[in-house]
From Swiss-Prot:
It catalyses: 5-amino-1-(5-phospho-D-ribosyl)imidazole-4-carboxylate + L-aspartate + ATP = (2S)-2-[5-amino-1-(5-phospho-beta-D-ribosyl)imidazole-4-carboxamido]succinate + ADP + phosphate + 2 H(+). NCBIfam families: purC. GO terms for biological process: 'de novo' IMP biosynthetic process; cobalamin biosynthetic process. It comes from the Bacteria. This is Phosphoribosylaminoimidazole-succinocarboxamide synthase. The lineage of its organism: Bacteria, Bacillati, Cyanobacteriota, Cyanophyceae, Synechococcales.
Amino acid sequence: MNHIQGSLIYEGKAKRVFACENPNRVLIEFKNDATAFNAKKRSEIDGKGRLNCKISAALFKLLELNGIPTHFLELQSETFMIANKINVIPLEVVIRNIATGSLCRETPINQGTILNPPLLDYYYKDDELGDPILTERRLKLLDLISTSQIEKVETITKNVNKILKEYFDDLDLLLVDFKLEFGFNSLGEIVIADEISPDNCRFWDKTNSDPKERILDKDRFRQDLGGVIDAYEEILKRIERDSSNSS
């Protein structure tokens, strides 16, 4: 079903959110903008919005089929999705299966270390503050959500990790880590929001042992490795191939 695009509600680094005729729904546009290091590094990559929109839609559908609540409703076009309107919780929830990135910069943990159990971290979502990491006590001090809601978010995140790890393992991809955002829908239920794509997930190709060539996510942009679109296309291709085999 096509929805009429209304006024701009919010514009972030990678997406625009528009009102639509149903006040409980929004239209989300995925942009081609690429940013890293809290937008200190910027570029525009043709086709990125389309790929992230389609990948996110496929993964939201997968999660919904497995009983995980998300804001996703349907694709409007290759770069627009229709979603339930939510009140965003200003938290970024990161779960790590393999050590890389900031974890290795900030601790003595070696790159590539398997984290068992996976490490779950909270960050306060605020660009001006640099999205600082939150200790358990700071999280409680901010009082963004209740203790029971924190437990709900952790349970959902761990379940998502289990589902996606197994799913991508079958696609010869290692799910290194990923970030989730959450919000409350009109019924007051906690649901996954934002996106799930190579912009906020790290994927390593299991069929490639080269530490740079195996990267199939936004680290290609962060590290100036090139081939960003090729990497994102490869993720979508494997997802679509799996979908074709399953149907």
